[in-house]
Amino acid sequence: MAIATAYCGHRAARASVLLTGLVMVVGMSLLSAPAWAEEKVTISAAFSPDKLGAPALVKGGAEFSSTTSRVPSPISKITIIGPAGLSLDLKGSATCSQAILEEKGPEGCPARSVAGSGGGMGIFELAGQIIEEAFTVEVFVGNNKPGHYEVLLYVNAVSPVSVQLVFHAVIVQFPKPYGLGFSFDVPEVKTLPEASNASVKNAHLTLGATPAEQKHFHVKGIIVPKKCPKGGFPDEAIFGFEDGSTVAAKSTIPCPKSSKKH
């Protein structure tokens, strides 16, 4: 696992928004100009197990803060881009739908449709007071047809503000040295009257089929590339923020120690 930090800002004279970004990566670089406010993001990612050509879980985490504000700017869009050779095998999986999640919640989805889980800590400001709120994330297969893969993310928070959101993301192929990735917009999350919109302080996410799911449902899920390029697996994630700033994260996941670099 590797960890790195990045900063990004936006021009005061023009609030143009470059929206794209999220969690599966390590290390960062930034795309920005002289800034009015700066967002700081620290991200980590790893494969588990770390074995070439094998089904694995992808585990990622992120910490958010601002250099000029007590609360980081709310996230407006998230994109995750994996390395070339990363593949998905959803044979044996089931699917869920946005309508079911909105009506019944995760309990309405088939067990075979589960594709990951996570959570984190939300944060907002009210009358000078910083308020934190835990949230959970559950990920489901929305479409398991090859070439048309989709995932659904269900975010749930209970107190002090009740929030239930469903995000829809289409999985697409990015140019080399990258591979599969997905992106989704994040709407404004209102909190309490006179309070700021909800931001994220930290988040963690695990994607893929667990060993139990692989055994009982025969779903491989995410498969690590068969070859690791010299220097490791290149990954990228970009976070678009409500204040117009963008943090672009480019990094590598180290090759398995026992693998031969290509």
Residue ranges with predicted function:
Residues 1-14:
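N-terminal secretory signal peptides that target proteins for export/translocation
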Residues 16-29:
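Bacterial N-terminal signal peptides
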Residues 24-27, 35-262:
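Ser/Thr/Pro/Gly-rich, low-complexity intrinsically disordered stalk/linker tracts of secreted
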